[in-house]
């Protein structure tokens, strides 16, 4: 397992990177927290959330290692009876996954992003009594440290 300091650094870098997605339907993608400010007129929110920590997948004889950071992007909307809004949520998250394949994050000195890729297609994973629904896409970042 990667050190907590390394994971914190990766999480911060990934959040900055996710917020460069040009087609995000919100002003800011947040970390591990979805809030909708009805008073401000917000009707959607997005968050990056880590999944089960970061794993070292390979150690190199000459030093350094390769690791995998698993995360998901969550999109919360209130679609009402609109199937079109639901489909648009999936489409936007799948588009994020496509964008992520070609846009490597800057992870700082000594850490090199190898690839970012979705591990699933977007899907709905929660519905709430107040009418909001959460959609998610699961992803992973492969990176090298001190190589």
Predicted features along the sequence, with ranges:
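Beta-rich nucleic-acid/ligand-interaction surfaces
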Residues: 35-43
